[in-house]
């Protein structure tokens, strides 16, 4: 015996057929053979409440349709809007009315303009009705006008004319056909009162409109954050990186950034503290300095050390973690002097382990300026990064040569995007010895020097620490230099044509200041325009 299970389309057809039968009056039978009870009738108030709840649920950003994949809830959206709602606040309306100025600034433009239009119409109606009652009591509306009778307001004979007189008084348009006389002191007092109320109402409206237009909320929308954050090695330390940029030419003054790590925390007594905030030290480099110079896009760096909340997360546990990292950027708007705040957040699924951000800045030699390509603002590329947690990585004492990955291909991409070649980056102080002079004064057993000669082995320096040493400038000591603190270094003789058109090469340019201090009469080195291609051999001469 074969059982056939109806598909979803057939089940929907059967359900619609049963619903149609119920609407026609034939009640279907239930399992025990008894007819189903009639549906409960709902009241009008209950139906209105149900419709209001459905409309509010559909318009809420928390609502997710069943046909779509459910997304993880977050406290702060990518656009900076906080996903937090307050309920059951005692005396909320009363507190909002006490702070009416802030309430009016926070409401939307359409509600604010509608409220002000209603306030104007209400003011005109109240004072127009007052003028009409004064004219009615004074007898100005009687059809047979008495002889030698002076009205309080001339030519005010209907409700509409009194309304127009109130509008003229409110906006100081100027009296024409209708004007006030000195017959009634009460009418004059009402005119003065209306002038004061109109002045207060217009001042309040202008102040709110100006404050609403000048607030830096829209200025914060021109600050963009990267869609993804990355974790990679930087100077031998695992770092959490994200990128921030400002699209405007008027920059933020005294900009500083903060990182908040939000997760549930369990105390020693077993109490679960929801949404606990951990402060994460962050800055534009590995130094703990939260101040930014936001002229070009900056990569924010948080060093993952023992004090970091990311210290025990590895590549696998990061994907199943439950936390949220909120980035807060604050600064003073240069044009208005007001404080602007931009914020975003990153979930564990938005943190890429073992990636770097692509470079945006391209030097244009044609006009001497720097070009920023925002098409690559969110782009990353994978690099060699340990998959273990920072705690395990630091305790294992790894060899950093295994994770070295020079981004020379990024500079080639910059050369292709630029109209002219991009200048070489300055050497990093982490790639070279701290005392270059001692590096050259090493013993003969060092792999940098050959066994039988005191010549400098360029291949050993090139492969030292797994890093490529870029071409650098040499400073020749003058013949009159008699300093006993360093050795004389001379070059092998080369072709005269090459010597006249090229510059000498030796160690990094960061050592120039050492040589200048040791040689009192040495001149400033000449700039290198076209470095030679062939390697330069350097001889070590003993002290004189």
Swiss-Prot record:
Membrane-related topology note: Multi-pass membrane protein
Residues of the signal peptide: none
One GO biological process term: regulation of egg-laying behavior
Annotated keywords: Cell projection, Ion channel, Ion transport, Membrane, Potassium, Potassium transport, Transmembrane, Transmembrane helix, Transport, Voltage-gated channel
Pfam families to which the protein is assigned, alphabetical: IRK, IRK_C
Domain of life: Eukaryota
Entry keyword Membrane: yes
Tissues where this protein is expressed: Expressed in neurons in the head and tail with no expression detected in non-neuronal cells in these regions. Also detected in the egg-laying system of adult hermaphordites with strong expression in the HSN motor neurons and weak expression in vulval muscles.
Record's GO cellular component terms: monoatomic ion channel complex; neuron projection; neuronal cell body; perikaryon; plasma membrane
Transmembrane residue ranges: 110-134, 187-208
Topological domains annotated Extracellular: 135-158, 178-186
Keyword Transmembrane helix belongs to the record: yes
Ranges of compositional bias, category Polar residues: 438-448
Phenotypic effect of disruption: Strongly suppresses the egg-laying defect caused by a mutant form of egl-6. Very mild defect in egg-laying behavior when deleted in a wild-type background.
Cytoplasmic side: 1-109, 209-544
Record region (Disordered): 411-448, 512-533
Intramembrane segments: 159-170, 171-177
SUPFAM superfamilies: E set domains (SSF81296), Voltage-gated potassium channels (SSF81324)
Chain location of the short sequence motif Selectivity filter per the record: 172-177
InterPro entries in alphabetical order: Ig_E-set (IPR014756), IRK_C (IPR041647), K_chnl_inward-rec_Kir (IPR016449), K_chnl_inward-rec_Kir_cyto (IPR013518), Kir_TM (IPR040445)
Intracellular or extracellular location(s): Membrane; Perikaryon; Cell projection
Molecular function terms from GO: inward rectifier potassium channel activity
Similarity remark: Belongs to the inward rectifier-type potassium channel (TC 1.A.2.1) family.
Entry function: Inward rectifier potassium channels are characterized by a greater tendency to allow potassium to flow into the cell rather than out of it. Required for modulation of the activity of the hermaphrodite-specific neurons (HSNs) by the G-protein coupled neuropeptide receptor egl-6 which in turn controls egg-laying behavior.
Protein name: Inward rectifier potassium channel irk-1
Gene name in the database record: irk-1
């Amino acid at each position: 015996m074969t059982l056939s299970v109806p598909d979803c389309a057939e089940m929907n057809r059967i359900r619609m057929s049963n619903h149609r039968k119920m609407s026609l009056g034939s009640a279907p039978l239930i399992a025990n053979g008894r007819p189903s009870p009639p549906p409960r009738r709902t009241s009008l108030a209950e139906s209105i409440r149900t419709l209001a709840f459905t409309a509010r649920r559909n318009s809420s950003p928390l609502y997710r349709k069943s046909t779509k994949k459910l997304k993880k809830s977050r406290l702060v959206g990518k656009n900076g809007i906080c996903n937090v709602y307050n309920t059951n606040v005692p005396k909320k309306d009363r507190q909002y009315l006490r702070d009416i100025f802030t309430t009016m600034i926070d409401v939307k433009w359409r509600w604010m303009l509608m409220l002000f239009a209603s306030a104007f119409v209400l003011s005109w109606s109240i004072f127009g009705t007052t003028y009409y009652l004064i004219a009615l009591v004074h007898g100005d509306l009687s059809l047979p006008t008495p002889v030698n009778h002076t009205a309080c307001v001339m030519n005010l004979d209907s409700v509409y004319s009194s309304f127009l007189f109130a509008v003229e008084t409110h906006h100081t348009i100027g009296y024409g056909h209708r004007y006030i006389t000195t017959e009634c002191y009460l009418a004059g007092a009402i005119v003065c009162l209306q002038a004061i109320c109109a002045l207060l109402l217009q001042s309040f409206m202008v102040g709110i409109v100006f404050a609403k237009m000048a607030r830096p909320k829209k200025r914060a929308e021109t600050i963009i954050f990267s869609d993804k954050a990355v974790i990679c090695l930087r100077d031998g330390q695992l770092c959490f990186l994200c990128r921030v940029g400002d699209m405007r030419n008027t920059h933020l003054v005294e900009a500083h950034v903060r990182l908040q790590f939000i997760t549930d925390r369990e105390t020693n007594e077993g109490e679960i503290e929801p949404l606990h905030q951990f402060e994460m030290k962050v800055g534009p480099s590995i130094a703990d300095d939260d101040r930014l110079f936001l002229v070009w896009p900056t990569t924010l760096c948080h060093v993952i050390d023992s004090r970091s909340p990311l210290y025990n997360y590895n590549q696998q546990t990061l994907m199943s973690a439950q936390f949220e990292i909120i980035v807060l950027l604050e600064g003073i708007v240069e044009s208005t002097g007001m404080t602007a705040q931009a914020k975003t957040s990153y979930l564990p699924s938005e943190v890429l382990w073992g990636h770097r951000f692509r470079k945006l800045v391209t030097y244009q030699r044609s006009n001497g300026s720097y070009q920023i390509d925002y098409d690559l603002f969110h782009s990353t590329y994978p690099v060699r990064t340990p998959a273990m947690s920072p705690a395990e990585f630091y305790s294992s004492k790894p060899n950093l040569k295994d994770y070295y990955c020079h981004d020379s291909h990024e500079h080639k991409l910059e050369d292709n995007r630029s109209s002219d070649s991009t200048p070489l980056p300055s050497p990093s102080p982490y790639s070279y010895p701290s005392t270059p002079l001692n590096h050259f004064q090493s013993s003969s057993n060092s792999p940098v020097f050959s066994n039988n000669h005191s010549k400098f082995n360029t291949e050993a320096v090139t492969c030292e620490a797994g890093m490529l040493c870029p071409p650098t400038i040499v400073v020749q000591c003058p013949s009159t230099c008699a300093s006993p603190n360093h050795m004389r270094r001379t070059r092998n003789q080369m072709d005269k044509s090459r010597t006249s058109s090229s510059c000498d090469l030796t160690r990094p340019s960061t050592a120039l200041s050492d040589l200048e201090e040791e040689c009192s009469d040495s001149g400033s080195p000449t700039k290198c325009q076209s470095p030679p291609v062939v390697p330069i051999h350097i001889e070590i001469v003993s002290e004189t």
